[in-house]
Regions:
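Short HxH-centered metal-ligating active-site micro-motif
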Residues: 57-94
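Short glycine-rich, low-complexity/disordered patches
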Residues: 25-36, 72-77, 159-164
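Short linear motifs in intrinsically disordered
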Residues: 21-25, 94-101
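Short, surface-exposed beta-edge/turn micro-motifs
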Residues: 28-33, 70-72, 94, 103-107
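Glycine-rich, aromatic-bearing surface loops/beta-hairpins
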Residues: 97-164
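Short acidic, S/G/P-rich loop/turn micro-motifs used as interaction or catalytic elements
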Residues: 53, 80-83, 130, 137-138
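Short loop/turn segments at secondary-structure transitions that flank enzyme active sites
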Residues: 38-40, 81, 114-117
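N-terminal domain-onset segments
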Residues: 1-63
């Protein structure tokens, strides 16, 4: 997967949300899309699922089965972000939502099921800043859940090919 694919899908999601939602940085549910990219064309993004709890959605076997035919999938969710400049905040367990410098953030994770590559973008509600992570840098419960979903989707894909 190329970084250009991430940029293009991030832009499509951003523009679409801005056109259709009053609060594109306060989503009521996390969203997942099946994604296909064809040379010279806009990416095809098919809504697959949404759920108010991202972890419930990512743990769903039916969602894994629904995304298995696609070469990629994208996850979009919103929440709070806080600067990591003060290590004591992290050590004290201060959640980003309570940090005095908190910001609304929308995260897009793009997963290539053929190469196991995961890229992400972060957009902030109070600026035009975009941070692109072209390497698999994430860690923690969200990354673990995304990797688990990818593994389960691959099992569904193998099972379907075996039965064809």
């Amino acid at each position: 997967m190329k970084a250009d694919t991430l940029y293009q899908i991030d832009r499509e999601i951003h523009e679409g949300f801005n056109l259709t939602m009053m609060k594109p940085f306060n989503l009521e549910a996390a969203h997942i899309y099946g994604v296909e990219v064809f040379p010279g064309e806009r990416p095809m993004m098919i809504p697959v699922a949404e759920h108010p709890d991202i972890y419930t959605m990512l743990d769903s076997s039916s969602v894994a089965e629904d995304i298995s035919p696609y070469s990629m999938f994208a996850i979009v969710t919103t929440g709070w972000a806080a600067p990591l400049e003060d290590v004591t905040d992290i050590e004290d367990g201060l959640p980003p939502s309570q940090h005095p410098k908190r910001r609304r953030v929308r995260v897009l994770m793009l997963v290539d099921q053929e190469t196991d590559q995961i890229m992400s973008s972060l957009r902030f509600g109070d600026s035009d800043d975009v941070i692109y992570n072209e390497e698999r840098e994430g860690a923690g419960s969200l990354m673990d859940a995304v990797e688990s979903l990818m593994r389960t989707a691959k099992k569904h894909k193998r099972g379907r090919n075996f039965n064809d």
